Structures are given as structure tokens and as C-alpha cells.
Amino acid sequence: MSETTQMQEFLSRQAEVCRDNCEIEKDLYKELGVKRGLRDVNGVGVLAGLTNISCIKSSEIIDGEKVPCEGKLFYRGYDIYELVDGFMKRDAFGFEEITYLLLFGKLPDETQLKEFKEILSQSMTLPKNFTRDVILKAPSKDIMNTLTKSILTLASYDENASDISMENVLRQCLMLISVLPMMAVYGYHGYNHYVNDDSLYIHRPDPDCSMAENILRMLRPDKSYTELEARVLDIALVLHMEHGGGNNSTFTTHVVTSSGSDTYSVIAAALSSLKGPKHGGANIKVVEMMQDLRKNVDDLSDEGQVEEYLRKLLHKEAFDQKGLIYGMGHAVYSISDPRAQIFKAFVKKLAFAKGREKDFELYSMIETLAPKVIADERKIYKGVSANVDFYSGFVYSMLDIPLELFTPIFAMARIVGWSAHRLEELTNVDKIIRPAYQSVQDEKEYIEMEER
């Protein structure tokens, strides 16, 4: 959409007016006891709700004092390490089993898991001509926008879209979990064809394949993938499924659910939250940062040169001048992120299989150096370690997943957590979420038009 000269001048002028009138003195937040970002100075979130779905632990009580500990993550009370080890020992894919656990609170037996997989397969169908009429029309490079548009449009095909009974919401959630990968991959293919002039191919999912296998199958021209590729992607999905009720997109799920809104609107809102670069787009920043590092460091095996680049990042002298080392640190974890710890072993296997050992060694070096550099350069209130985003972008690049699908892959996993939290919010809370905002604007006398 083009803009007139008048429009451009107006926007430039009035944007400055907006900046002047929107700014609030930073000291007022501290003076009035406002928890910015709903977190205290140590990064601990304000207690806004209770949940049975997952638990994150980054500290423990020793001799009456709270001290940092290795990060722990529990899904429905089960340690994530044990869950991953459990399905890996059986040589099984974990997405469907852990989805069942998060939604229903119990680990399924063989009969229950078989039935659940059949239900997900039955739900893996889009309305007639939906791909052509909705997904492929007006293709966008931003696949998250494509997903949001598609999900809101799906509501038009649902005669009970606004019914928020448990049975209906569960049906809707299972359907959206099943079709979200299709909409994302088809959306990318549409963009790649109509914008990049590449070949267009639409592969239907195979009901006998796992979610990870189907994602790779639908994405690739020849539908081929190795077992290792599918298993590493499956692990990535499991590790990204759920992370408490306070992360931005899941809290959005609670907020919009509390208003009584329908499932399609709730998931669209969560997607809009996840789309933000401060939330779901972090792994893209890691990949871009690593590309910049390779351009600006002569010897990638030299720790001194790599450390110098990391310090430049913190001094806002490199990459995007934001002063951040992407993939390092987390709002909750300090000593370690268990998801990153689990993921690293699988990343290493894939890197060696793909001939990317040197790249893996570089990532490992940065994982070791960055916390030390940050501790030297910054005043920090807790430890810093690599988070799961640090390695996920590297994995997706090894799987030949395009950059446009990095955040949608996150969404394919996290929609499970959103669904579980929506069901929990509907069950337990009957009040709309409404935190307080205090006005710091002085009262003014009205000015007549001719006196302005």
C-alpha cells in the first residue's frame, strides 16, 4: 500500500508527538512499586495464578536460604528428563504421548495412546478448498500472520465456534493441534511459489506417521527424511510444548480465555504474542547473530577472538547493536535450562551426521564463554546459561527448515500447552483477568477550539 507525501509528513510529525506524550518517567515505576513486565528486579514473576500443568524450578532451599540450582522442568509432575528418556528407550516418538499427558494429566497406556493417535489423525483434515482459498491466497513471508489468518477463518467453518463447553473446546483444540503444521507448511510453500517463484507442492499428512515425520514429509519435495532427523525434530517439539502459565503467549491464552472468548480467537491471540521477537523469534536472532560472528571473526577456533566479538555484542558494537548475546539467559533459569541440556546431546548427534562438527564446536564454545563474558560486563542478579533457543535455530537449519518456519515450528509445539492452559482456565476461574494500571497524568482544564 502506497502512502501520499501528505500522509508521510503527517506520520513523521505525529509520531514524534506520540513519543513525547507516551513517555512515562522511569523513576515513577520504582516509586509507585510497579513490577515492570510483571517481574521484580530479580526477574521473578508476580504470582498471578495457579496451575497443574507444568513446573519450572531454578532454586532450592538449603539451610533456610533460597539458592540457585540446576534448572528443572516438570510436565504434570513428571521430570522432563524422565519423560524423554522414557519414550526414547522404547524407540518411540514423544509428541503424541506428551500431548496426551499435558491435556489429560496422565501418562497414557498403549490402548489410550493408540486411540489418541487415531483421534489426532482424524482431526488432520482442512475444510474443502481451504488450502486454495485461504492459505495460498495473499501469501505472506510472515507465516505467523498466515497462521493467525487461517485459524480465525477456520471459525467460519465451525457451526459451534463460540461454544465453550469442555467437550467442544477439547474438540477444537485437538483439531487445531492437528492442522496447525499443515497450515504453516502450506503457507510457506505458497509464499515460496508465488513470491519466490519456486515450485509449488502440497503433500497430505500420512495418518501413520508421527507429527515430526509429517512436518518433514510435508515440507520436503520428495517427502524423504532420515529417522535421526525426525527424532531430533520430535525432541524439539516436546521440549517446546509447555513452559508454565506466565510466559507471554500462555498468559495471553489465560487472559483471552478469561473473557469468555472462543478457542479460535484465543489461539490467534497466543500466536500473535509468540510472533514477537522477544518471545518466539529468539532462535532466529541466534542464527543471524552467528552469521554475523562468522563474517567478523577471522579464526572461529580462537577463543580469544570469539570472546572479543561477544564483548562487542554487549557493548552494542556488533550485530544489531542491542547489547545482547542471543540464546543466553532466561527469565527463570539461572544455572542451566534443562531443555537446552537435553537438546544438546541430540544436536551433537545430528551435527556429526550432517558433517557440521565445526559448527557444533563453535556453539559449544560460545555456550561456555558467554556466561563468563556477561558476568564480567554486566551487573546480574542471577546466573546466566544457554537457553533452548540457543540450539534450536541451529537444528532447524541442519534440517533444512527455512527461516520463515522457525517460529511456526515453536507454535506447532506450544499450541499443546496453550490448549492445556485454556482448558484449565475454563475449569477453574470465573473472573475476567484485569490487573490495575495507575494513571500518572495530571488533570487538565478543557480548552475551547478557538483558544488552542
Describe the residue ranges of each PLM region:
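Non-transmembrane, aqueous-exposed alpha-helical and coiled segments at domain scale
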Residues: 1-452
